[in-house]
């Protein structure tokens, strides 16, 4: 795989050493299957998470363009917005965040705690909207207003999920392959599939590095019919950037996100509690809890291609636990 093409893209080193890839002995015994976990929840900044991999590329591009302001969008409890705001603070940039309330709650805890609390600590300028119905257009409109105020904005899409940001997860696939070499033959990889950049980047990288491993994206907000084109389009855009072929089938499970994005469900919360009690690792109610619910049920329903070891990609999100009390 010509990963040397990755070096063509400016990148800031926020993460440093590879994040741990760990065996989960007690959880494995409970499920009757070897379960490993990639700990992207412990990336260095702002309580960790997967978006920092994307921001290494996106923030480097922003600096290259001479930007002094990062603009992005998400839910009030967005992990991506939190990490973008932290990166802006570290780089001495202004950050403007366009936020929506996707679950329509008036609960004070959701509106002020968790990720939202951290945005204030990072001195983020908050702009509220009724809904992110067309986030790309809404971000461009916000950037125009910010530019009129004399700033030099750089727009980062929802989730940092464009071809440039998703290169962070092609890089992650290389890291995973190196960590598994001579240690474990991973049969299946499970990841939450939302804004699609993490899923698509892994799809491109793992196709070339661990071609015998199946990659399952557990959707957190959309049906397979709606999510599939998002992942495929990004997969092909990444491959074009890297001058690679990308022909791996995109596999999605959409049985675990109901009743909707950002709304906890019983299966997801049970997964959060199980991993906390067996391994002392914190998942979240929005992304990783639902993805882990898919992994657990997938074993029970024999949905995986075989009974080999499974790798769970922990994308972070624990700060949201505080916002979702008393559901937790």
Swiss-Prot record:
Keywords: Lyase, Pyridoxal phosphate. This is D-cysteine desulfhydrase. Catalyzes the alpha,beta-elimination reaction of D-cysteine and of several D-cysteine derivatives. It could be a defense mechanism against D-cysteine. GO terms for molecular function: D-cysteine desulfhydrase activity. Disulfide bonds: none annotated. Its EC number is 4.4.1.15. NCBIfam families: ACC_deam_rel (TIGR01275), PRK03910.1-1 (NF003029), PRK03910.1-3 (NF003030), PRK03910.1-5 (NF003032). InterPro entries: ACCD_DCysDesulf (IPR027278), D-Cys_desShydrase (IPR005966), D_Cys_desulphydr_bac (IPR023702), TrpB-like_PALP (IPR001926), TrpB-like_PALP_sf (IPR036052). Its cofactor is pyridoxal 5'-phosphate. GO terms for biological process: D-amino acid metabolic process. HAMAP family: D_Cys_desulfhydr. Belongs to the ACC deaminase/D-cysteine desulfhydrase family. Pfam families: PALP. It comes from the Bacteria.
């Amino acid at each position: 795989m010509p990963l040397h093409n990755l070096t063509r893209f400016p990148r800031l080193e926020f993460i440093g050493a590879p994040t741990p890839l760990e065996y989960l002995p007690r959880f494995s015994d409970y499920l009757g299957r070897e379960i490993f976990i990639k700990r992207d929840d412990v990336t260095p900044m702002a309580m960790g998470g997967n978006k920092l991999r994307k921001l290494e590329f996106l923030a480097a591009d922003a600096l290259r363009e001479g930007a002094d302001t990062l603009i992005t969008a998400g839910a009030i409890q967005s992990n991506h917005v939190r990490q973008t705001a932290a990166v802006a603070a570290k780089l001495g940039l202004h950050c403007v965040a366009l936020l929506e309330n996707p679950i329509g709650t008036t609960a004070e805890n959701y509106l002020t705690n968790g990720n939202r609390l951290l945005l204030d600590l990072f001195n983020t300028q908050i702009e509220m909207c009724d809904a992110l119905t067309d986030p790309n257009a809404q971000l461009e409109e916000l950037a125009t207003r910010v530019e009129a105020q004399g700033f030099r904005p750089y727009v980062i899409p929802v989730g940092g999920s464009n071809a440039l940001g998703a290169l962070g997860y092609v890089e992650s696939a290389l890291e995973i392959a190196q960590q598994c070499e001579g240690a474990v033959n991973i049969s299946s990889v499970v990841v939450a599939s939302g804004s699609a950049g993490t899923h698509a980047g892994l799809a491109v990288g793992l196709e070339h590095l661990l071609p015998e491993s199946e990659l399952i994206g557990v959707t957190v907000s959309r049906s397979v019919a709606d999510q599939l084109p998002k992942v495929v389009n990004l997969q092909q855009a990444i491959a074009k950037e890297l001058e690679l072929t990308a022909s791996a089938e995109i596999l999605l499970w959409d049985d675990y996100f109901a009743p909707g994005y950002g709304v906890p469900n019983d299966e997801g919360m049970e997964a959060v509690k199980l991993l906390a009690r067996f391994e002392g690792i914190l998942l979240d109610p929005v992304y990783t809890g639902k993805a882990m619910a898919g992994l657990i049920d997938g074993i029970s329903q024999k949905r995986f291609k075989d009974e080999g070891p499974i790798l769970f990609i922990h994308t972070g999100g624990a700060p949201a636990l505080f916002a979702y009390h008393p559901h937790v």
